[in-house]
Regions:
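Transmembrane alpha-helix boundary/anchor motif
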Residues: 20, 61-64, 106-109
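Non-transmembrane, membrane-proximal soluble domains of secreted or membrane proteins
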Residues: 26-43, 67-224
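Alpha-helical transmembrane segments
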Residues: 43-69
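N-terminal secretory/membrane targeting signals
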Residues: 1-27
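Hydrophobic transmembrane signal anchors and adjacent membrane-proximal interface regions, especially
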Residues: 11, 50-53, 126
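Alpha-helical transmembrane segments of integral membrane proteins
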Residues: 7-15, 46, 88-92
Length: 224
């Protein structure tokens, strides 16, 4: 009896493990709170749908062909000398080429439109924030207001925020998933990032680049 129960548990263990792991995930990228993140979500969904154009037919054909040409199906058409089909060649080459061309144009336009250093068009004066990554915290300086904070930033909603980012230690990745666009913080260099929050809230910020033992706790809060 115990052995039977053990086998039943082991049978569903992968499913249970998967559910537990996924329960700790958040679909932040699919629930954007800013202009840049909304445009990036559209790009992700478009690329995903184009991928399904290839993936779904392949999966269906694998299932259909396996069933149709199974050993027990004596009624299946048998063509041992088949070697070429112009129709098949046209499909397997044309569809991927069209998808690649579409993605190439989309990527080119999106890369320039979502360039992190490109200022956002707005009638509202942007907020300037200097960002310095340290071990294992974030230092934020407001040069216009003459104040500084650690692991917390606050800015007005619907107002562009111009980040000037560098590192006082090793390289890190500055990322507010709900607002979009990750960019590196590098020692001796300055990178720029322009974001805007479309609604009020407190958003999680992280270091998206592994930089050492304490990187998992290198988080901050961004409040709009």
């Amino acid at each position: 009896m115990r052995h039977h129960n053990y086998k039943a548990v082991m049978k569903y263990l992968p499913v249970i493990t998967g559910v537990l792991l996924l329960s700790g995930c958040q679909a932040v990228l699919l629930d954007p709170k800013g202009q840049i993140a909304i445009e990036q979500r559209a790009l992700i969904i478009t690329a995903f749908c184009l991928m399904l154009v290839v993936v779904i037919p392949v999966i269906l054909m694998a299932v259909i062909f396996s069933w149709k040409y199974r050993a027990s199906n004596t009624a299946a058409k048998y063509t041992p000398d088949w070697s070429h089909s112009n129709k098949v060649e046209a499909v397997v080459w044309t569809v991927p080429v069209l998808i690649i061309l579409f993605l190439a144009v989309l990527t080119w336009k999106s890369t320039h439109a979502l360039e992190p250093s490109r200022p956002l068009a707005s009638v509202v004066k942007p907020v300037e924030i200097e960002v310095i990554s340290l071990d294992w915290k974030w230092l934020f300086i407001y040069p216009q207001q003459g104040i500084a904070t650690v692991n917390e930033i606050v800015f007005p909603v619907n107002t562009p925020v111009n980040f000037r980012i560098t590192s006082g230690s090793v390289m890190n990745g500055f990322f507010i998933p709900a607002l979009g666009s990750q960019i590196y913080a590098m020692p001796g260099m300055q990178t720029r990032l322009h974001l805007i929050a479309g609604e009020t809230g407190t958003f999680d910020g992280i270091s998206s680049s592994y930089s050492g033992r304490g990187v998992s706790g290198m988080k901050f809060k961004a409040t709009a």
